[in-house]
């Protein structure tokens, strides 16, 4: 039986809410048959932060796994877990935010979330389906949607609120009128896309920086193998007797950033937590610092001549 790891946490802004610095991601299409077993095994290993979204097929089975974990005594109460979900683009309108969160809670059988994020800084008409049609793309009412997110927190539907895939410029729009500051900005980050400027901005504003795709999201529509095939990381992994994945995840963690890992393989789930009792040296960090940069999650789907973002440069405000 693998040992249970105690994962360090970070306090989110002035909320007093603590979030485990390594989370368990649940995005997969279609969801594997052993997903619930994977979640239960993750809890046994020590994972307490589970990341989902209304557009993922994992909300309901995650909720079922939490119920089972309580029944089995793997956790004593739901309060031991930190659950994040996200507002999808078809619900990113001021009057649809609260109903969308309530639907996510119903899907999971939960009374509250620990964190609720705006998934992406763009909207789709409520009737939109996948694949996305360019004519369905709409600009986001940042101020109105954020006010509705604030109401979610005031109502106790979520303990904290935040954003995902937001640039510094788009965060500035939120901050200009926000009564409750975003607790989190969850974005792509790994040794091949280090996000130094955005990290500095978030740190200055008291917004916790959280990383998805720490290994490059190989096998997804937006993923690439540039992390897993990186010679610098391979050399460091060999020298330290660690896997390349451990080097990449440790690097993110060592930046003071939380990281959402994703594997339903029991061995790799355990391996991804074996990052706390060793460090990357200043020399190793310097080598990683020099790796050529590449954004994997580019969002071309939401670029349109008639939409809010006519180019990728506009979408990412030059952060590309």
Curated annotation (Swiss-Prot):
PROSITE patterns named among the record's database cross-references: ALDOKETO_REDUCTASE_1 (PS00798), ALDOKETO_REDUCTASE_2 (PS00062), ALDOKETO_REDUCTASE_3 (PS00063)
EC number(s) on file: 1.1.1.-
Example GO molecular function: oxidoreductase activity, acting on the CH-OH group of donors, NAD or NADP as acceptor
Gene3D superfamilies the UniProt entry points to: NADP-dependent oxidoreductase domain
Source organism, top-level taxon: Eukaryota
Organism: Melia azedarach
UniProt keyword list: NADP, Oxidoreductase
Record-given protein name: 7-acetyl-epi-neemfruitin B aldo-keto reductase
Catalytic activity from the UniProt record: 7-acetyl-epi-neemfruitin B + AH2 + H2O = (1S,3bR,4R,5aR,9aR,9bR,11aS)-1-[(4R)-5-[(2S)-3,3-dimethyloxiran-2-yl]-1,4-dihydroxybutan-2-yl]-3b,6,6,9a,11a-pentamethyl-7-oxo-1H,2H,3bH,4H,5H,5aH,6H,7H,9aH,9bH,10H,11H,11aH-cyclopenta[a]phenanthren-4-yl acetate + acetate + A + H(+)
Functional description taken from the UniProt entry: Aldo-keto reductase involved in the biosynthesis of limonoids triterpene natural products such as azadirachtin, an antifeedant widely used as bioinsecticide, and possessing many medicinal applications including anti-tumoral, anti-malarial, anti-rheumatic, antibacterial, anti-inflammatory, anti-pyretic and diuretic effects. Can use 7-acetyl-epi-neemfruitin B as substrate.
UniProt record similarity statement: Belongs to the aldo/keto reductase family.
Pathway annotation from the record: Secondary metabolite biosynthesis; terpenoid biosynthesis
Active-site residues, as the UniProt record annotates them: 56 (proton donor)
Tissue occurrence: Mainly expressed in petioles and, to a lower extent, in roots.
Gene that this polypeptide is encoded by: AKR
Pfam families: Aldo_ket_red
């Amino acid at each position: 039986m693998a040992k249970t790891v105690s994962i360090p946490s970070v306090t989110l802004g002035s909320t007093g809410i603590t979030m485990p610095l390594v989370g368990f991601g649940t995005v997969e299409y279609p969801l594997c048959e052993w997903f619930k077993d994977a979640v239960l095994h993750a809890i046994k290993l020590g994972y307490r932060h589970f990341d989902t979204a209304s557009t993922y097929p994992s909300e309901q089975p995650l909720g079922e796994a939490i119920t089972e974990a309580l029944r089995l005594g793997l956790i004593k109460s739901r309060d031991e877990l930190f659950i994040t979900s996200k507002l999808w683009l078809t619900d990113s309108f001021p009057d649809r935010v609260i109903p969308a969160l309530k639907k996510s809670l119903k899907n999971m059988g939960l009374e509250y979330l620990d964190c609720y994020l705006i998934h992406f800084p763009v909207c789709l008409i409520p009737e939109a389906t996948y694949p996305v049609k360019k004519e369905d793309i709409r600009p986001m009412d940042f101020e109105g949607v954020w006010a509705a997110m604030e109401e979610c927190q005031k109502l106790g539907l979520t303990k904290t609120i935040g954003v995902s895939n937001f640039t510094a410029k788009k965060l500035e729009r939120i901050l200009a009128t926000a009564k409750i500051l975003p607790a989190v900005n969850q974005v792509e980050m790994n040794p091949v896309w280090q996000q130094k400027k955005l990290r500095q901005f978030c740190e200055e504003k008291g917004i916790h920086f959280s990383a998805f795709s720490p290994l490059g999201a190989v096998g997804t529509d937006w993923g690439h193998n540039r992390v897993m095939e990186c010679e610098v990381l391979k050399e460091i992994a060999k020298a330290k007797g660690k896997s390349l994945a451990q080097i990449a995840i440790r690097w993110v963690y060592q930046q003071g950033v939380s990281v959402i890992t994703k594997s339903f393989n029991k061995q790799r789930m355990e391996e991804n937590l074996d990052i706390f009792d060793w460090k990357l040296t200043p020399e190793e960090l310097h080598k990683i610092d020099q790796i050529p940069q590449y954004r994997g999650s580019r969002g071309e789907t939401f670029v349109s001549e008639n939409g809010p973002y006519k180019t990728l440069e506009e979408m990412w405000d030059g952060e590309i």
